[in-house]
């Protein structure tokens, strides 16, 4: 901002950034960037992420030199992202026509390990080793939706406000 504008501009004059609510912002040069107050408050992206982790470990001494260990871990998560760009904005998405998008992801993973560990002293020689395996499972589901062609109603961020039919996609991935 300091580089692109002269000293005659007082940034405080642009704090009240609406000329016409939800349609036109107050700014000196609308050709390639927006009022910084407007960008900070109106061109938004948000992300909410929740995760729960769990872990369980058990071991059993089979003999003085042989031990079995079992481990299991799991996590479950959800994430919601939302992007909003007002009608008339040079910044963000939507090419001055407005834009709204949301994305929801959810998934979980489970990891199970089994380890058989041996440690044996025979005379002056010490032998140790282990044998183990793991089973892993992961699943992720994603729902994504966005407006197309802009927003019909300025300031109303909903797929119902899409000029053209909203674009949606759903995907699911799982593997072991």
What function would you assign to each model-found segment?
Residues 1-51, 69-175:
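Surface-exposed loop/interface segments of Gram-negative outer-membrane beta-barrel transport/assembly proteins
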Residues 60-64, 120-123:
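Outer-membrane beta-barrel strand-turn architecture
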